[in-house]
Regions:
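Cleavable N-terminal export/targeting peptides
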Residues: 1-27, 179
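Outer-membrane beta-barrel "beta-signal"
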Residues: 166-179
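Solvent-exposed loop/turn segments connecting transmembrane beta-strands
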Residues: 44-52, 76-83, 117, 159-160
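Short glycine/proline- and aromatic-enriched beta-strand/turn motifs that initiate or cap beta-hairpins
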Residues: 21-75, 176-178
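A short acidic, helix-capping loop that chelates divalent metal ions and anchors anionic groups
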Residues: 41-43, 113-115, 155-157
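Gram-negative (and chloroplast) outer-membrane scaffold detector with strong preference
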Residues: 59-128, 135-144, 174-177
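Short sequence motifs at beta-strands and strand-loop junctions characteristic
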Residues: 50-54, 80-82, 121-126, 163-167
Length: 179
């Protein structure tokens, strides 16, 4: 009887361990930081104002074999404007080994910012597209993403005669810790 009980406990332990190992293979949870450099243009009718810009942010997400979903916060800092951006992103990954190309889209909002310390940025919808490469570091639980991205936000603030649009574009480095 003791041998039968010991065998059942051993089997339960092995099956429980196998279940956890398989669950870890299905998806990964991650958190990370981003840093980007590029430019932005504010379009107001025939008047276009382009400046250099930087982006700083944080992400948290879930990585599934062919898709990655994440929540992202960014602070966009240009010489004439400063703003906060919250996005929900979806990435579609090409299956590969260590270097994985991907294509991404995002939907979110631009909020709490200003242009020339004169105009307050309204809470407006924002859209973005990303194209990049993920470098999977197999020995340590980090992934490094290098990507180009374009963010578009229509009617970010209102003047007496115009509702300018924002186009932000940058090259971004993202470091993700995989739990």
């Amino acid at each position: 009887m003791r041998l039968k009980t010991a065998g059942l406990l051993t089997l339960a332990t092995l099956l429980g361990g196998a279940t956890n190992a398989n669950a870890a293979m299905l998806y990964d949870i991650y958190a990370g930081l981003t840093l980007g450099a590029g430019g932005q243009t504010i379009f107001a009718g025939d008047d276009n104002n382009s400046t250099s810009a930087a982006a700083y942010g944080a992400v948290i997400g879930m990585d599934i074999p062919l898709v990655r979903i994440e929540l992202e916060y960014n602070y966009l800092n240009a010489s004439e404007s400063h703003m906060h951006v919250g996005m929900i992103n979806a990435y579609f990954k090409m299956p590969s080994t260590v270097i994985k190309p991907y294509l991404g889209i995002g939907l979110g909002t631009v909020f709490n910012g200003d242009v020339d310390d004169t105009f307050n940025i309204r809470n407006e919808a924002a859209y973005q597209g990303m194209l990049g490469l993920t470098f999977d570091i197999p020995v340590i639980p980090f992934n490094v993403d290098v990507e180009g991205r374009v963010l578009y936000a229509p009617d970010v603030f209102k003047t007496a005669d115009a509702k300018p649009d924002l186009l932000h574009y940058d090259l971004r480095l993202k470091l993700r810790y995989v739990f």
